């Protein structure tokens, strides 16, 4: 994976293989977006938990304003060992899945799986019950999702949870506390 640090708004960790880095810097990629918006960023690399920890230390030393980590198993494995570094430095970490927020990141933003499941079920029912042609069934995309906010991290960053939840650009905002797994969270 690679760490992309933005001195203004966004920092991103992306898979470190050539295809993903190519996509990240492509016309459709975030690198182009950041450049276009005049947002400064730097890159860090790491392929092990130890290297991810060192990259997190470097991000803190760089004084970045924010971190964004898309869904990545290497980062997920290291999350419980890096999230406190960002809290202590006052750096919010935004991520691509709720499991990262569970493991201490400030916000996990991802697919609204209930909405996705309903739409998928509707498409399958249309094919099975109404003889819709799978080959001509349109591909559906969603432009919103679910934000999961770690309340402990929000507090550690000195952020007011109600302000964080105000006017979200997603279908819902869920609250969670830090734990190793969803089974460990009291319902």
What function would you assign to each model-found segment?
Residues 15-20, 48-51, 72-76, 98-102:
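Solvent-exposed loop/turn segments at secondary-structure junctions
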Residues 1-37, 137-153:
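An alpha-beta-alpha
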Residues 45-60:
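Structural motif
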Residues 78, 82-106:
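Venus flytrap/periplasmic-binding-protein-like
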Residues 126-187:
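Hinge/cleft segment of the Venus flytrap/periplasmic-binding protein
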Residues 1-6, 111-132:
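Hydrophobic alpha-helical segments within soluble ligand-binding/sensing domains
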């Amino acid at each position: 994976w690679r760490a992309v640090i933005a001195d203004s708004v966004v920092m991103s960790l992306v898979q470190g293989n050539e295809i993903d880095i190519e996509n990240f810097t492509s016309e459709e990629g975030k690198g182009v977006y950041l450049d276009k918006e005049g947002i400064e960023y730097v890159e860090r690399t790491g392929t092990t938990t130890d290297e991810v920890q060192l990259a997190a230390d470097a991000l803190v030393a760089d004084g970045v304003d924010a971190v964004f980590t898309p869904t990545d198993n290497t980062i997920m494995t290291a999350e419980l060992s890096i999230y406190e570094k960002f809290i202590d430095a006052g750096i919010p970490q935004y991520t691509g899945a709720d499991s990262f927020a569970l493991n201490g990141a400030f916000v996990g933003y991802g697919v609204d799986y209930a909405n996705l499941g309903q739409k998928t079920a509707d498409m399958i029912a249309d094919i099975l019950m109404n003889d819709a042609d799978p080959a001509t069934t349109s591909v559906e995309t969603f432009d919103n999702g679910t934000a999961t906010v770690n309340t402990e991290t929000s507090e550690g960053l000195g952020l007011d949870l109600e302000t964080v939840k105000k006017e979200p650009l997603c279908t819902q905002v869920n609250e969670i506390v830090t734990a190793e797994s969803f089974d460990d969270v009291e319902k």
